[in-house]
């Protein structure tokens, strides 16, 4: 796929899909910057295990911190070709019992954090007339998931942000696309796979999944991203790639 020699900045890169993407891109010869907000030690451990990788700390909710991050990563990596917006949170927000702090935290990390990173890196990518931006959406951006209305809303916002930015940035040589996973085995959604109270929901999801898989792996998602940031995907702008084991195909 000829992505060796590129550089990538990955928010939320210390675990889950972000970590898998960091490992996959590094295996292809990409120099990766792994960003964590509260788990810097894990980011440093991941970076230490990968050739040419570096760890950075930044709270994606803080636009000034993200601007500093982009500047620091640019100097350390020698530029940034690829931005992966993988930072995010996932938890239930039932109507009637969700406080404003829980609402704001999810919106700020998932939506504002994605925007902050893109807003900070866009001038550099425009100047070099080259860039690949991959946002992490979700299958629930396009279908409902009871009890998780705020999460659904954040991911729908990211999908539409992707489409609008693709129109804006494509003339500058920048590709903006979105990967929307289905149920993927990561620490963020461990409760769905292990909580006995949620087993009926998981059983229904499995029954409705054509592949018969209860979940995808983070590595499955990373393999798709490796293609999306390659020249082989040069015709893709504003795409929302659903990778959900076929769960949404019949909806």
Q: Which stretches of residues belong to each language-model region?
A:
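Short, small/polar-rich loop/turn modules that mediate ligand/substrate recognition or access, typified
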Residues: 170, 175, 236-238
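Short C-terminal tail/terminal secondary-structure segment
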Residues: 2, 143, 207, 226, ...
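Residue(s) in the substrate-gating loop at a strand-loop-helix junction
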Residues: 138
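Substrate-binding pocket helix/loop in short-chain dehydrogenase/reductase
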Residues: 94-95, 99-107, 205-206
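Conserved glycine-rich cofactor-binding loop
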Residues: 14-15
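Active-site helix of classical SDR
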Residues: 118, 154, 162
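Catalytic Tyr-x(3-8)-Lys segment
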Residues: 97, 198-220
């Amino acid at each position: 796929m000829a992505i060796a020699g590129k550089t990538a900045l990955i928010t939320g890169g210390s675990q889950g899909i972000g970590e898998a993407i960091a490992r996959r891109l590094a295996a292809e010869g990409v120099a990766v910057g792994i960003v964590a907000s509260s788990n810097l030690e894990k980011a440093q451990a991941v970076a230490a295990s990968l050739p040419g990788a570096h760890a950075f700390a930044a709270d994606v909710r803080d636009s000034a911190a993200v601007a500093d991050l982009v500047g620091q990563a640019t100097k350390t990596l020698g530029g940034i070709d690829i931005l992966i917006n993988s930072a995010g949170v996932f938890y239930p927000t039932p109507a009637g019992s969700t406080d404003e702090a829980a609402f704001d935290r999810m919106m700020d990390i998932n939506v504002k954090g994605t925007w902050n990173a893109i807003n900070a890196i866009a001038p550099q990518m425009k100047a070099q007339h080259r860039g690949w931006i991959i946002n992490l959406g979700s299958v629930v951006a396009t279908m409902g998931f009871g009890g998780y209305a705020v999460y659904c809303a954040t991911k729908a916002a990211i999908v539409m942000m992707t489409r609008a930015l693709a129109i804006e940035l494509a003339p500058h040589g920048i590709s903006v696309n979105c990967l929307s996973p289905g149920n993927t085995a990561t620490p963020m959604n461990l409760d769905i796979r292990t909580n006995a109270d949620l087993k009926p929901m998981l059983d229904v999801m499995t029954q409705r999944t054509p592949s018969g898989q209860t979940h995808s792996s983070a590595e499955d998602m990373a393999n798709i991203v490796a293609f999306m940031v390659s020249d082989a995907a040069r015709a893709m702008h504003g795409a929302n790639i659903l990778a959900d084991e076929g769960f949404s195909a019949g909806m």
